[in-house]
Each structure stands twice: as structure tokens, then as C-alpha cells.
């Protein structure tokens, strides 16, 4: 038998997926699906076979799980016939195989079998139109499953056989079940009341209703009045014929098969079948060894019809000898109606499944009793001893040889005792065990019925027949035949546990002599090879040629510590010598400890000078030479650089030394750190050499360090917010305050501070927020050169640089670097072409320029007004006029700027008052006639008519104007900060 557990889990799950797809996951609850899945996995561990036979004369294998046969796959009645609503399974009465739809309460019931209404033959599950053998006696299945005709009795006559040979052309009505009146049916009365027969009761055609008879069973098959039924009785079965053309309003109830209250006991014979691999199904199988003397013939009555009368009579005589009748007279009373429980297939219940099924025996033969007797005796003797030892092998996980070996260890319970216990459990679960039945049954009958109950509950779905081989174990073979070991018990061959043999083996190994671990001291070993008076002498001897004094490297006064005694293995521990019992253990331990210390702590003593003189001449010369070598002065080792220096490196060093020797030594000036002079000297240097340009100083620092400094110093929690790229709503964009940032900047060194500033100018937001903090720190540390660099950096962000430019210029003006600052502004920040775009920056530049040396850049101011149409504000002109009143050259340049827009100047009272005061002071110095002709240039233009003056140009609106110039976040974030031109 193949082991199903070898099938991969993926294949099992694919089958389960097909089941779920077919039924639908919503058809059952989750708890029911879990129960079904456990039973589904358990079903793969059960042995099974597939009976492909459709021949009703061949019984099903009762010791294996058989796939149910489908009925009426093809319609034998023509196109006008209709199939039954539920499947019908054809099965002989003497077969105890499981049925298609069993349940816990239906284990005793049998299925109805259909017969052809035309000829009275038993109709197979598949139409005989396509069958190869028209007669069941010639079927190949009849040749394969040959078994003795156990249920054929001597009551049947040759006339009855001839009637069956004529196919029972005349229809016979079924007599009453318990009270037959027909004389021709009297011979069949034992079979009519047998418990294994299908008993049907039909209503008459004209009778509208039919009440239950007192002798009838509670579960009967009742057909509708319109249905036609013909009853055909055989030697082995009582079949029912249904006309499927009739109306479907039929009521089918199953009859309990093993009801024992109103039926007589049927005589059965032991059937034994042998399963072999389905390689050649046409080869007949040999019977079991304990049934070799019995006749092994065909099991079909139809096959008996094909025999000659002479052979048939001989067969009938042989069957009479082997047939055992057990008659039982019982009262004909209706059995209690069975309760039908809703549940799944019994094959899914693990408790009702057996690893092996014995043969179904209604009456044990003498051979079965002889086999069971030694089993009962052995069980009673060794039940208590074998119970903790015997373990049942896992179900469905062993092959046939392993299964037989494992069954040898399970001899603690006999066959009939185990069957009776499980039958009791099944009957209690179904609720059909009553006191009345128990009182009316004998132990043998209970056992036989239990076997039938168990066999009827082992139905399970099987798999393909070509993939697995059938079971080789003989059916009905008791456990004693399979478990035989060559160990005589009471002069007989009985079953012996393997564990018992293992126990004897272990006892034998324990009784074997083991080598004793003798612990011997080294002293004892020495005493064996030495005499009693001989001992090791470690003292000095003049005759010794060699001495171990040279191995001493310590000092003379050195105290040598005693070595701790070495821990030896447990087997090598020193055992005390046997001494009289009067002595105590303490002196023995002390003596042994002193002995161990005296031996292990021994060292060869160093020789003194006196002892050295007494040494032999050879040893004396050796010692003297060693002392001379120690007193010699060791030569100084060569420098390691010269010793280990490679040749190429030494040649290169020599060339460098020769080159340096040929050149004269030159002195190089020592330069101080750049841009770290005092403020006073710096102001003097700038004023003396105004053309000097201070370069920008950049320090190389890694970007990663700068990013880390930015996070720590400024307290930035979201780097995406620095570049205005954060899209999160709940992100934290808060930073440290200006005071906290300035405290951190003050504690930094100069290089770190400058590096952090270079990282800051890369961000528009950080530049706008912390620019003034860096200006204050550089001013506090007198780093004026870095302030000039910061002044130039205002060109990077022109839209926000107007207040920043004023702040840094104010810091530079305090140290006297105004001209240098104006020069940097006019070189890098002055952009007349973008004056209208960055009006704030241009106005701030004009304010700085009007308060500084504006006369040096008068041409640029004139160009700004004429070429770029940017009018200089009046407040800047007023500042320029006030600063040039005392100087005639500057005043002349100021008048040039004023005359650019004479109409707007005339409306300004401040400018007109300054000009009038200037003209009065100039006329006071000269005569009035000369003052009119030699007045300041441009004075005559003020008297010109307004029409002669060119109208002023319209101003372009300022798109980059900031209404609230602050150092915090503003709307100027969207301006392209990289557009510097």
C-alpha cells in the first residue's frame, strides 16, 4: 500500500483549493471549515483502494476504504426516463463495505439497489450497453475476486436455480416480512428476517396511505402510488426495482441493517480476501494460508448458473459441510426508530477510524477461536507490563513491512476486545444503545455487530487507483499470525516484545566486567623499578660530568615561590595507602601533602663559588668562559635607519645632500598671518594705499561638517525648510533665537566661524536671518577684513540686501574704513542697469555715497540720471549741497547734479534756500557787477522759463520693493536668488 503522506503539501493544498472553489467559502462557517480541513489532512494518512468494478455480484472490499460507485451514469431506459434525485449505489447484501451517505445514526442502514424492470436482472451502476461482459459470471471482476459462496444455504433447490437461469421472467410480489403466507416463500423465511437483508415494504397501487405494520421495521422504503415496483429475490440479495419514469414524489427511508429485535440471525461464513497490486487484474488470487482447505469459488449466483448440474451439485454439497447455522428465535417487534444526526462523513472523525480492520465475522470458526485464545492469555499476563511500553505507530505513515513490524509491539489487547470497546463507543455516540438490546444479545452477537458498525463508518474519498498499490496484508488474519518471534514461551511460539529483548541486552551489557580505573601514584611506579633503599639523590656529587647550574637565571638571594600542586584528573587522583583502621585520616593527608610539596617544589640549587672550585676542570672552564663573555663590552649597534634603509632611498638622500651643499643658504622672510593687523594700523594702511584690494579668504572645510554645525548652532530641525522645499504640514520649522546663536558663535574659533559663515550664505533664509549676527561677531573680534567680504556678499541677494548693506557699512565706518567700503560698494554692488528693479538697494547706496566721498563718483551719478533715467532723490541732493558749500570745487559738481532737473528743484524750498544763501555769500565777497557775470555756473538756468526745461521722465515701478525689510522669513523667498546680474 502506498503511503499518502509522501504526497507533497502543495498537492494537498491544491486539492483543498479545488474543494473550496467548488463548494464556496460562504457555505460553511469558519469553525466548520477548520474541522473539515483537519479531517481532510487526516484522510491522506489512511489506506485505501479504488474498486472500479461496476459488477453488483462482486462485493466491496470491507477491510479498505473504497470510493463509492456512481449509479446510473448512463440512462438504460431510453431518452424518456428520468434519473433519481439522489445517487443509487448497487451493492450485494453480504457486503459490509461503507455506504455513500453514512452518518453517526445511519451506520446500520443500507442503500436501495435498483433492478431492471424488464428482465429482472440486477442493474449495474454503469449501463451494460457498453459493458464487455453481458453476464456477470463471465465478468473479469468475478475472476479476480473469487470467494466462496458463504451465504448460499442448502435450502435452495435446483428449481430455484433454473428459475434464476430464466431471469425470473414472472414478477413475484414480496411476502410479509415477519409473517409470510406463501408456501413457496417459506424456504426463504430465515433470509427474510436476517439482519443483513434489505427489507422494503411497498404500498399497494390503490391504497392512498399505508400504516406501519407491527412486525415491520420502523425505517421502510415507501414508494408513491404511481410508481411501479417489482421485487426480485436472490440467494444473496433482495433488490428493489424502481421505475424512474414515475413521478419523483417518492419517499425513501433506509432500513437499519443491523437491527436485532425482529430479525433472525443470519449465518455467515468467514470471507478472506487478498489484495495485490493491480498490475494484472485477471490473475486469480490465492486464499489465505488458514483457509487453504476450504473451497474458493466464485461469489456470484449468476456465475453458479453457468455451471453444469453435476458440478453445481458437488459445490452445493461442499458448501453444506462448511456452512454453520445459528438459528435464533426472537420476538417480532418494531425496533426503536433511529435518530438521524446532522454531521459530516464519519471518515472525518478520527476516533472512529482504525489503523486496520479485521474481517467481519458473524460467527467465529474454530480456527478463529484457537487464534484468539493465546492472544487473550498473553494480554491478561502482560497487560500491565506492556501498557507503558507499547506505542502505536503514527497512522498512515508506514509501509506494509514497517506496519507489520509495528504491529508486533501492540499485543496488549485482543481483536475482539478492541472491537467491542470501539463498538461501544460508536453505539453510545449514536444514541442507539438501549437496555433492551443489551439484555437480548449475547457477547458473540455484540462483537459481530460491532464489527459491522465499525466497517460501515470508514467511508472516505479515495484517490486514483493507478497511483497506489493495494494492501498486501491478508484480510481476517489475526494479530498473532503477524507477530511471531522465535522466543519460546511455555513451549509455544508466542508474541514477544522487542523492548523485552532490549532489556535483556541492556542487562547483559551492565553485567559485563568493566576495566577498573586504578589510580596509582608515581611513587608506586618508581618503587616497582627501584629497591627499598634506593631513592633519588638531588645533592651535589663531584663525579657528575654535567650540571644543571647553568639553567639558573635568577639571583642568589631570590626566594623561589613554591609551585601550587597541579590539579590532576579524577581518575588520576592519589589514593592513600591502606593503613590500619586505628589511624585517623588527618595524619594521612598531612603526610601526603608534605610529600607532594617536597617533590614538586624541588629545584636544582645554584652552585656557589666554593662549590665551583670543587667542580671538575672541564666544568670549571665552561663557567669561567661564560663570566668572561658577560664582562666584555658590547659593540654599539649600527643605527636602524642605516641598516634597514633601502638602496634607492639612500641614493636619493645622497643626491639631495649634494645638491644642498652646492647651493648657498638663503634666508626667507617670516610672514605674519594675513589680515590680522590692529584696527589703527589697518585704517592707516587703507588710507595710504587706497588702491589695495583685500582678497577674500576661503577656508576648506567639508560640507558635511558645515551641515552638522548649522544644525547644532542654528537649531534647525528640518533642512528642507531652509531651502523652502518642505511639503509637510506638521513639520517643525522653529530655530534658535538670535541671542542663542550669538552665544554659540562667540565660543567658536576664527576658522570655524568663517567656515560656518560660508555655509550660511548658501541659504537665502539663513543669510537674511543671521547676517547681522555675523557682522556683530566680526566687529566684536575686530575682523574688519571679513566685514569687507560680507559687504561684497550683499550682491548675492539684492532684493533683501538694502538693510544688510547699511548695517555692515555702519560697522566699517566706525573703524575709519568709509572710503574702502564705498569703493567695494561702487565696484561690486553698484548696478545702475538694475536700479529700477532693486530700487531699495540703489537708494541705500545713494545714501551711503552722499555721506561719503561722492565727488569721486560724480560722473556715475550723472550717468545714472541721464542714461538710466533714475532721478537722484532730493534728500541726497540736499546732503550733497550742504557738504559742498564751503568748497567751491565740490559746490560746482553739486550744481551740475541739481541742474539735471531744474523744475523739481524750484519746487523744493530747502534746495532753493541753500542756493540763495550760497549766492549771497558769494556776492558779499565780490562786487555786485562782477557777481552777476561771474556767478556760479548754472545759476542763470533757475531764471529760465519753465517751458524751456525738458519735462521729467516717468519712473519705472519697483517690482522688488520690500515694504517691511526684516531679517526673518518674508515673501521674497520666491525671488530667484541666483540672478545676480
From Swiss-Prot:
- Give the main location: nucleus
Which keywords belong to this entry? Chromosome, Cytoplasm, Cytoskeleton, Developmental protein, Differentiation, Nucleus, Oogenesis, Transcription, Transcription regulation
- Region annotated Disordered sits at 72-195, 274-307, 327-352, 375-446, 554-586, 642-662
Where are stretches of biased composition, namely Polar residues?
104-113, 150-160, 422-446
Could you provide one GO biological process annotation from this protein's UniProt record?
A: mitotic spindle organization
Which intervals of the chain are annotated as region Required for interaction with rhi/rhino? 1-60
Q: Does the keyword Cytoplasm apply?
A: yes
Record's function text: Developmental protein involved in oogenesis. Required for germline maintenance, stability of mitotic spindles, localization of patterning determinants, oocyte growth and fusome biogenesis in males and females. Also required for dorso-ventral and antero-posterior patterning of oocyte and eggshell. May be involved in microtubule function during oogenesis. Part of a rhi-dependent transcription machinery that enables the generation of piRNA precursors from heterochromatin while maintaining the suppression of transposon-encoded promoters and enhancers.
- How would you summarize the oligomeric state and partners of this protein? Component of the Rhino-Deadlock-Cutoff (RDC) complex, composed of rhi/rhino, del/deadlock and cuff/cutoff. Interacts (via N-terminus) with rhi/rhino (via C-terminus); this interaction is direct. Interacts (via C-terminus) with cuff/cutoff; this interaction is direct.
Under what name is this protein listed?
Answer: Protein deadlock
The organism that produces this protein has a lineage beginning with: Eukaryota, Metazoa, Ecdysozoa, Arthropoda, Hexapoda
User: Gene encoding it?
Assistant: del
Amino acid at each position: 500500500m502506498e503511503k499518502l503522506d509522501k504526497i507533497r503539501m502543495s498537492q494537498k493544498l491544491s486539492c483543498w483549493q479545488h474543494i473550496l472553489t467548488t463548494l464556496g467559502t460562504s457555505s460553511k462557517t469558519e469553525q466548520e471549515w477548520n474541522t473539515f480541513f483537519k479531517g481532510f489532512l487526516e484522510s491522506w494518512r489512511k489506506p485505501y483502494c479504488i474498486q472500479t468494478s461496476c459488477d453488483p455480484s462482486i462485493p466491496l472490499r470491507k477491510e479498505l476504504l473504497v470510493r463509492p460507485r456512481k449509479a446510473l451514469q448512463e440512462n438504460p431506459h431510453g431518452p424518456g426516463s428520468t434519473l433519481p434525485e439522489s445517487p443509487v449505489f448497487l451493492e450485494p447484501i453480504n457486503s459490509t463495505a461503507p455506504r455513500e451517505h453514512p452518518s453517526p445514526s445511519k451506520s446500520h442502514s443500507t442503500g436501495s439497489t435498483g433492478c431492471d424492470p424488464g428482465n429482472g436482472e440486477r442493474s449495474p451502476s454503469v449501463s451494460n450497453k457498453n459493458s464487455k461482459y453481458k453476464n456477470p459470471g463471465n465478468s473479469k471482476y468475478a475472476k479476480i475476486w473469487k470467494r466462496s459462496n458463504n451465504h448460499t444455504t442448502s435450502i435452495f433447490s435446483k428449481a430455484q436455480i433454473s428459475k434464476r437461469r430464466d431471469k425470473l421472467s414472472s414478477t413475484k410480489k414480496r411476502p410479509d416480512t415477519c409473517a409470510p403466507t406463501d408456501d413457496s416463500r417459506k424456504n426463504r423465511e430465515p433470509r427474510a428476517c436476517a439482519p443483513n437483508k434489505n427489507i422494503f415494504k411497498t404500498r399497494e397501487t390503490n391504497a392512498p396511505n399505508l400504516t406501519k405494520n407491527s412486525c415491520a421495521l420502523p425505517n421502510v422504503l415507501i414508494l408513491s402510488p404511481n410508481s411501479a415496483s417489482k421485487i426480485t429475490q436472490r440467494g444473496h440479495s433482495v433488490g428493489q426495482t424502481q421505475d424512474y419514469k414515475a413521478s419523483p414524489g417518492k419517499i425513501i427511508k433506509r432500513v437499519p441493517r443491523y437491527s436485532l429485535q425482529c430479525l433472525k440471525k443470519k449465518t455467515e461464513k468467514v470471507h478472506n480476501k487478498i489484495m495485490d497490486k493491480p498490475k494484472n487484474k485477471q490473475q486469480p488470487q490465492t486464499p489465505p494460508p488458514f483457509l487453504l482447505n476450504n473451497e474458493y469459488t466464485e461469489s456470484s449466483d449468476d456465475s453458479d448458473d453457468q455451471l453444469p448440474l453435476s458440478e453445481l451439485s458437488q459445490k452445493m454439497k461442499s458448501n453444506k459441510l462448511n456452512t454453520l447455522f445459528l438459528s435464533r428465535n426472537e420476538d417480532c417487534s418494531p425496533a426503536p426508530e433511529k435518530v438521524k444526526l446532522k454531521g459530516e462523513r464519519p471518515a472525518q472523525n478520527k476516533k472512529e477510524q482504525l489503523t486496520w480492520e479485521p474481517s467481519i465475522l458473524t460467527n467465529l470458526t474454530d480456527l478463529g477461536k484457537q487464534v484468539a485464545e493465546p492472544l487473550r492469555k498473553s494480554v491478561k499476563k502482560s497487560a500491565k507490563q506492556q501498557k507503558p511500553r507499547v506505542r502505536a505507530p503514527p497512522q498512515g505513515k508506514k509501509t506494509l513491512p514497517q506496519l507489520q513490524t509495528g504491529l508486533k509491539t501492540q499485543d496488549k489487547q485482543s481483536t475482539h476486545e478492541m472491537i467491542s470497546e470501539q463498538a461501544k463507543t460508536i453505539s453510545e455516540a449514536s444514541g442507539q444503545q438501549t437496555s433492551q438490546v443489551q439484555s437480548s444479545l449475547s457477547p458473540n452477537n455484540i462483537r459481530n455487530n460491532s464489527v459491522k458498525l465499525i466497517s460501515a463508518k470508514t467511508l472516505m474519498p479515495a484517490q486514483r487507483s493507478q497511483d497506489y498499490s493495494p494492501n498486501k496484508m491478508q484480510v481476517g488474519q489475526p494479530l498473532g499470525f503477524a507477530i511471531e518471534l522465535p522466543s519460546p514461551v511455555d513451549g509455544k511460539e508466542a508474541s514477544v516484545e522487542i523492548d523485552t529483548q532490549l532489556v535483556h541486552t541492556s542487562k547483559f551489557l551492565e553485567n559485563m566486567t568493566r576495566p577498573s580505573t586504578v589510580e596509582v601514584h608515581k611513587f608506586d611506579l618508581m618503587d616497582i623499578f627501584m629497591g627499598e633503599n634506593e631513592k633519588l639523590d638531588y645533592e651535589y656529587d663531584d663525579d657528575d660530568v654535567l650540571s644543571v647550574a647553568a639553567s639558573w637565571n635568577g639571583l642568589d638571594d631570590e626566594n623561589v615561590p613554591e609551585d601550587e600542586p597541579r590539579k590532576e584528573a579524577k581518575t588520576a587522583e592519589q589514593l592513600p595507602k591502606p593503613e590500619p583502621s586505628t589511624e585517623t585520616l588527618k595524619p594521612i593527608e598531612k603526610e601526603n601533602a608534605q610529600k607532594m610539596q617536597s617533590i614538586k617544589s624541588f629545584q636544582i640549587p645554584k652552585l656557589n663559588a666554593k662549590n665551583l672550585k670543587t667542580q671538575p676542570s672541564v666544568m670549571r672552564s665552561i663557567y669561567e668562559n661564560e663570566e668572561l663573555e658577560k664582562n666584555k663590552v658590547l659593540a654599539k649597534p649600527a643605527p636602524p635607519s642605516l641598516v634597514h634603509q633601502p638602496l634607492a632611498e639612500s641614493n636619493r638622500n645622497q643626491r639631495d645632500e649634494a645638491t644642498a651643499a652646492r647651493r648657498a643658504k638663503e634666508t626667507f622672510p617670516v610672514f605674519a598671518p594675513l589680515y590680522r593687523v590692529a584696527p589703527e594700523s589697518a585704517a592707516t594702511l587703507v588710507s595710504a594705499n587706497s588702491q589695495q584690494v583685500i582678497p577674500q579668504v576661503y577656508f576648506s572645510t567639508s560640507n558635511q561638517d558645515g551641515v552638522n554645525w548649522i544644525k547644532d548652532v542654528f537649531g534647525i530641525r528640518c533642512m528642507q525648510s531652509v531651502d523652502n522645499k518642505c511639503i509637510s504640514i506638521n513639520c517643525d520649522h522653529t530655530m534658535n533665537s538670535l541671542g542663542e546663536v550669538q552665544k554659540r558663535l562667540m565660543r567658536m574659533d576664527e576658522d570655524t566661524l568663517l567656515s560656518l559663515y560660508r555655509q550660511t550664505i548658501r541659504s537665502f533664509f539663513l543669510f537674511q536671518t543671521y547676517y547681522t549676527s555675523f557682522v556683530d561677531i566680526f566687529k566684536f573680534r575686530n575682523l574688519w577684513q571679513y566685514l569687507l567680504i560680507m559687504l561684497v556678499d550683499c550682491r548675492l541677494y539684492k532684493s533683501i540686501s538694502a538693510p544688510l548693506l547699511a548695517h555692515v557699512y555702519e560697522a566699517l565706518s566706525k573703524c575709519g574704513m568709509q572710503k574702502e567700503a564705498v569703493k567695494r560698494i561702487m565696484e561690486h554692488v553698484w548696478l545702475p542697469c538694475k536700479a529700477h528693479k532693486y530700487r531699495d538697494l540703489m537708494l541705500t547706496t545713494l545714501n551711503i555715497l552722499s555721506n561719503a566721498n561722492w565727488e569721486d563718483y560724480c560722473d556715475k551719478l550723472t550717468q545714472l540720471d541721464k542714461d538710466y533715467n533714475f532721478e537722484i532723490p532730493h534728500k541726497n541732493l540736499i546732503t550733497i549741497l550742504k557738504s559742498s558749500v564751503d568748497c567751491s570745487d565740490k559746490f560746482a559738481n553739486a550744481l551740475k547734479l541739481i541742474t539735471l532737473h531744474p523744475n523739481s528743484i524750484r519746487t523744493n524750498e530747502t534746495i532753493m534756500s541753500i542756493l540763495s544763501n550760497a549766492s549771497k555769500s558769494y556776492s558779499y565777497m565780490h562786487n555786485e557787477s562782477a557777481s552777476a557775470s561771474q556767478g556760479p555756473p548754472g545759476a542763470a538756468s533757475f531764471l529760465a522759463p519753465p517751458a524751456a526745461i525738458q519735462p521729467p521722465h516717468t519712473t519705472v515701478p519697483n517690482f522688488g520693493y520690500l515694504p517691511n525689510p526684516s531679517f526673518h522669513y518674508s515673501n521674497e523667498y520666491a525671488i530667484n536668488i541666483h540672478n545676480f546680474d
